[in-house]
Amino acid sequence: MTAFPRYPAHLLLAVLALGPWLAPAVAQAPEDAAARAELPEFMTIPAASGKDLTPAAALRPEGFTTWTRSQGDAGSRRYSALSEINRQNVGGLERAWVFHSGDGARNIQCTPIVVGGVMYAPTAGRAIVALDAGTGKVRWRFQVSQPAHPGLEDEPARRGLVYWTGDAVAAPRILFGSGDWVYALDPGTGRPLAGFGQGGRTALPTGATVSGVVYRETFVTAGLYGDIYGFDARSGAQRWRFHTVPRGDEFGADTWRGPAHGQANCWGGLSLDEGRGIVFAAIGAPQPNFIGVGRIGDNLFGDCVLALDAASGRRLWHFQDVRHDIWDLDNAAAPVLLTVTREGRRIDAVACVSKAGVLLLLDRVSGKPIFPFRLRRAPVSRLPGERTAPYQPDPELPELISPPDFRIEDVTTRTPKAHAFVMGQVARATYGWFEPFSEGRANLFMGTRGGGEWSGASVDLPTGRLYVTSNRIVSKVTVLAADEAERDPGFPPSAGEVAYRQSCAVCHGPDRAGNGMVPPLIGVQNRMNESQIRGLLRTGRNAMPPAPQMGEAQENSLIDFLLRRNQPPSRPAKAGTSGASMYTFDGYNFLTDDQGYPGIKPPWGLLNCYDLNTGRILWRVPLGEYPELTRQGLPKTGTQNLGGATVTAGGLVFCAGTADQMIRAFDAGTGAELWKARLPWGGYAAPAVYEAGGREFVVITATGGGKVGGPAGDAYVAFALPVSAPSSRP
């Protein structure tokens, strides 16, 4: 195996010719499969050793008894040192209280925080509430205003909030993002802090979604539509901004060639090494998804773990796993800080899971991989204008969470009819390891809902074991030629276009091209009929809510616009002038059988346990079930899940996130399921563990809806042992 990046001279020239240095005119030619085949099959980035391994700083696991951030702590470990609830007594866990916000029904993906016996959490009606953590009774409620720019994410604390204790100058505060603002609230009253920004909030230009971190007095957070920011946690003044898509002569700008400079978003989350002042960011796939012809190159800092100086925003290092990602294989979750043993020494590392099924394990200071990181020669594209990266990740250690590719032997055998139904789809599709897209033909891969998701991982600090929930769901995406004509700007918009701008453009974009997380509507007439569109407008689906109330005439006009009927005069589109405008795709679809179950063999959802000292998976068990299939005699299949796990010193792993609306407790050592309880709605965030009034609680956000599906609600549910139950600490 050759050490990357030591290419032989003639092969180095070939690799460079396939990289981001291509002139736009050359980019229209087909990729050279013969030149790609001359490259070595494997390359390897060597493992860190010697001085590149950072000795572990002192850390006291027993100190992890609070929940000051939605990810548990600044290192996103989701570990609790509490042990009143443990393997011996978890079977007696019961509901302690349920809080209903009563202000609507909405999917919430935020884990509450708990400080000093008070819980802070967002509600379905766009408020932040403070609850008595022991009883669930409301202490205060703050109503968050609508964002000034409706295209920005508008749920308060969508994926997290953080408590800052303050300092000699500033009082404690709750910090979170909402829409195009960062808010600072008084934890005691819920009132915005007047000395922070403008009346308790400061502008966040690219929208908010993740839970920030605080280093000394710098609050670091990320924008939904790109970039990472450092704010003064006292005053709200912006201190620095790091461009996740480099600009001008910034490092990495030459890895984007072409007109389609989309985003590379940190929507998975951040972590902080408080002692070293290093912020770690998980960066998602470059945009637009699936179509890379307008963004030739490796597309830094897409699909990277990025380390920044927390005080200045200066880049310290980055590690990119998927290059020129055209499959939406984000590093989707907050990096997790942990300690492992290498070369007989305790080493501080950072771990990050991806939708490609890769578990990155890197030294915190050098950024080098803890294990050799193998790359494999990747296929070339048949899509005119596309330029795939010569190599993609194929690591041996840590073992894959799940393979990124669909294989024919994966096809479901649930019933003969289900098998035949799926095989009919496979026969008309392309598939394979990092197989690029072909025009007009579905591509099957484990991607948009595969591997490790935004719910991320947790770590058992004393053992170094990492727990991650995962999905085995096959994406089915077709790239199509965008051959529509452009509307002549000399004519006024139709009534349907006006309705689209009012009701749809906020998510699908003014040009119907989507925004990377929302599918495009260009070419929708080729995949949906009038009845299907009308039904979708009226009922919504998954993360899409029903369209706002509109009269029949307005609805008909909107459908005409979407189906390209009765439109104003047009003129031919300028073919090939923009890589992004050459192609569109048919949405975020999945391979399913005749009854809507995943089109591959189970398990479809898993809880995985890693020993990261060795990089090996110790155990994995199905997560979730379809009771009707269990009754038919099928072993537990697992379900699609988006929630994440939390581990405790009681030897337990708690997680929800499944389609069956359950929360479960597993034995952290063996994976045995020890307890479960049904929730009023699905629990699509990780549980928090805390102590209030001398009693240990486990709380879960239970609001349903979202990408896993099911009805939406408004609940938080807390569990505890009965008051009379004897303590049995391990």
Task: Identify the meaning behind each predicted range.
Residues Q28-A81, T388-R414, A573-Y583, S727-P730:
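N-terminal pre-domain segments of enzymes
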Residues G464-T469, I473-L480, A688-P730:
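Blade-level signature of beta-propeller repeat domains, shared across WD40, Kelch, NHL, RCC1
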Residues R95-V98, R141, P187-P205, R234-P259, ...:
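Blade-edge beta-strand/turn elements of extracellular beta-propeller
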Residues A170-P172, G226, A281-L300, I473-D488, ...:
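Short, conserved, GDST-rich strand-edge loop motifs in beta-rich repeat architectures
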Residues D227-A237, D298-S312, V365-S366, L606-D611, ...:
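Beta-propeller blade signature
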Residues F64-Q71, R106-A127, E153-W181, T206-I228, ...:
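Repeat-blade elements of multi-bladed beta-propeller folds
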Residues R323-I326, N331-A334, R376-V380, L444-G451, ...:
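Conserved blade-ending motifs and adjacent loop-strand segments that build the rim/top face
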Residues T218, I278, G490-S494, V498-V506, ...:
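Extracytoplasmic electron-transfer domains, predominantly the class I c-type cytochrome c fold
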